[in-house]
């Protein structure tokens, strides 16, 4: 009887399908449960990864890069992570592990976690939760604390008219009708001569320029330094007073100091290293170097020529007063980075025993593109040099073939084929640290150029690496 029932059941095709279906339901239910729980765990992991990303990035923001206490950094990262990691479907809120590694100015933050995603089919999978884990790494180089040494050329060549219109007006108003000193007539330079009577004049070209509201290149340099230290209206951070330097200090959470110098025959100290605000109070003291009269540099009997630009000498003097730079971090015992900002037309004009980049113009007068030997010495100490080249161009005089014959003989050869590619420009580029060179031609915006160059030196970036 039983044998017959079994045989009949085995022969029944409908029964076979039922059995096969029943047998297949077991792995199907298992796979379906596993897929649902695995998908849920992946979603939880993505959310926790985002929380780890946020925590890592928050720990390398500029405000946090000034923090030197690892515990504070770790607690900050943990708090940001916890705010985003309190998710339903986890056995507990995970507590992240935060590691902080500082290497010089670079900080690396790693936020890692482990968690358990609750399974909806624990009996099917044989486990109440699915383990998940992840990590995120953020790495940023903090902007360094810096000392800036602003070195401005105030030699007679900086008395050139600021624009072509200024040059034309200066030439017009230094004609014999207005200027009785023959050596200063028809000149695009507003030289400051304290004894113009020696040459038969009653007022020097600087006085004429001021009375005619003619803007000079030295005026643009002064305005650019004023924007750097005293007044800038474009700071993206509200509540910051002062110039570009104070704005960048606030944005980067750094400490900047500034020193202010001019140079001609030698180095002139306007403000020793101090706060940007204190240095800014001395900007009004930037002025052209005075000469006694044409072909004389002082009021003694030792007049040699109207030379007055010793760039290498000024760099040598400033180098002797600068300390060895540090990394610029906030680590105890570290010191700021040191940066020289040189603003010049790049042509030396001095009495010297040797003239390596040119031939003597006479009376040991060396008029040459900058000898970059001192630049190499400075950079080898780890000091950075930023250079703003205010290009030395030939003066174009209306209806006069050549009024600047001296320039054509002793300067123009070093400006060929163009002022941007000649030896003067090349030597200044060589003097500057990589990427820290900018140039401005007559009529160019010196304030914008100096501001952009400063921002380039002071800027840093942060990036996320996962």
Give the residues covered by each predicted segment.
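Glycine-centered recognition micro-motifs in short, flexible terminal segments and loops
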Residues: 2-26
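P/S/T/G-enriched low-complexity
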Residues: 2-8, 34-466
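Short glycine- and Lys/Arg-enriched binding-loop motifs that mark or flank ligand-binding interfaces
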Residues: 11, 29, 342
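Alpha-helical hydrophobic helix detector
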Residues: 19-36, 50
């Amino acid at each position: 009887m039983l044998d017959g029932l079994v045989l009949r059941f085995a022969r029944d095709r409908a029964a076979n399908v039922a059995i096969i279906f029943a047998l297949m339901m077991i792995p199907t239910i298992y796979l379906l449960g596993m897929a649902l729980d695995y998908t849920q765990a992946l979603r939880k992991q993505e959310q926790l990864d985002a929380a780890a990303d946020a925590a890592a990035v928050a720990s390398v923001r500029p405000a946090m890069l000034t923090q030197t206490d690892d515990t504070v950094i770790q607690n900050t990262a943990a708090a940001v992570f916890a705010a985003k990691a309190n998710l339903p479907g986890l056995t507990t809120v995970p507590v992240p592990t935060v590691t902080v590694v500082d290497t010089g100015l670079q900080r690396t933050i790693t936020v890692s976690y482990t968690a358990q995603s609750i399974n909806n089919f624990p009996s099917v999978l044989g486990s109440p939760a699915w383990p998940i884990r992840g990590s995120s790494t953020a790495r940023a180089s903090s902007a360094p604390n810096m000392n800036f040494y602003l070195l401005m050329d105030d030699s007679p060549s900086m008395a050139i008219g600021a624009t072509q219109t200024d040059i034309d007006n200066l030439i017009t108003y230094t004609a014999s009708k207005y200027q009785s000193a023959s050596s200063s007539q028809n000149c695009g330079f507003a030289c400051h001569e304290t004894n113009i009577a020696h040459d038969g004049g009653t007022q020097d070209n600087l006085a004429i320029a001021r009375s005619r509201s003619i803007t000079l290149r030295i005026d643009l340099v002064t305005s650019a330094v004023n924007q750097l230290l005293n007044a800038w209206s474009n700071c993206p951070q509200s509540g910051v007073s002062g110039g570009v330097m104070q704005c960048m200090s606030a944005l980067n959470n750094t400490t900047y100091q500034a020193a202010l110098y001019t140079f001609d025959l030698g180095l002139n100290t306007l403000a020793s290293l101090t706060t940007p605000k204190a240095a800014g109070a001395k900007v009004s003291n930037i002025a052209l170097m005075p000469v006694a009269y044409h072909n004389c540099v002082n009021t003694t009997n030792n007049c040699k020529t109207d030379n007055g630009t010793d760039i290498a000498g000024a760099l040598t003097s400033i180098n002797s007063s600068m300390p060895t730079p540090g990394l610029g971090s906030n680590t105890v015992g570290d010191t700021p980075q040191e940066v020289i900002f040189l603003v010049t037309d790049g042509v030396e004009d001095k009495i010297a025993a040797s003239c390596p980049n040119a031939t003597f113009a006479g009376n040991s007068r060396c008029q040459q593109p900058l000898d970059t030997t001192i630049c190499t010495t400075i950079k080898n100490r780890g000091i950075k040099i930023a250079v703003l080249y205010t290009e030395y161009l030939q003066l174009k005089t209306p209806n006069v073939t050549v009024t600047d014959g001296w320039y054509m003989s002793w300067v123009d050869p070093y400006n060929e084929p163009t002022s941007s590619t000649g030896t003067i420009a090349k030597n200044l580029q060589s003097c500057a640290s990589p990427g820290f060179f900018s140039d401005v031609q007559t009529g160019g915006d010196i304030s914008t150029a100096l501001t952009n160059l400063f921002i380039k030196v002071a800027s840093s970036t942060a990036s996320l690496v996962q």
